[in-house]
Amino acid sequence: MPMKSLRNDHGTLKAMIGSDFNELTIAAKNLATHAFTLTGLGFGTSVLEWVASIAAIYLLVLDRTNWKTNMLTSLLIPYIFFSLPSLIFGIFRGEIGKWIAFVAVVVQLFFPKHAREYLELPVALVLLAVVAPNLIAGTFRDSWIGLAICLGIGCYLLQEHIRASGGFRNAFTKANGISNTVGIICLVVFPVWALIF
C-alpha cells in the first residue's frame, strides 16, 4: 500500500498501530510472567537452601546435646558443605575461615585436653571449606553432582532415622522424633526441589 493512501486512511493506520500495541502488551505480559516464574522458582530454591542448611546445623547441634540420636551425624558435614548458601560458604572459604581453621589446628595441637569433642565436626566443616580444591568447592558444589550427594545423604539419614524410630509412624510420635523427622525431611526436600526446578 503506498504511503499516500495510508495517510488518507486513518482507520487502517489506527488498526495497524493498535495491533502493534496489542502485540507489545502481550509480549510484555509474557515477559513479566516468565520473569516472575523464574524468579519465584529461584527464590524458592534459595529459601529451601537456607532451610536445609539450618536444618542440618540444627541436627548437628541436636546430636551434640543431651538428645543423642543413632544417626551418623558425620554425614551432615558434607551435606552442609554442598548445601551451604554461597554467602556463608564464601566467608568460610575466605580469610575468616582460614583464621578459624588456624586457631582450631593450634588448639588441637598444643591444647588437646581443651579441645572439646563437640567442636570436632564444626571445625572439620570449616577445614573442609578452606582446603577443598576449586573443582569440588566451585564446580561440584554448584552443580547437580552436589545436589545428588545431598539427596543421597538426606535419603540415607531419613531411612536410618525411620528404622531407628521403629517405623514411619513412630518417627512422628516420639518426643524428640518429630523435630528430627522434620529436620531430615528438609534435608531431602531441598535437593529434590533444586534438581527438578
Curated annotation (Swiss-Prot):
Residues 1-40, 93-94, 139-141 are extracellular. InterPro entries: COR413 (IPR008892). Pfam families: WCOR413 (PF05562). Its main location: membrane. GO terms for biological process: cellular response to water deprivation; cold acclimation; response to abscisic acid. Induction: Accumulates in response to abscisic acid (ABA), freezing and drought treatments. This is Cold-regulated 413 plasma membrane protein 1. It comes from Arabidopsis thaliana. It is found in: Membrane. The keyword Transmembrane helix applies. Belongs to the Cold-regulated 413 protein family. Residues 62-71, 116-117, 163-176 are cytoplasmic. GO terms for cellular component: plant-type vacuole; plasma membrane.
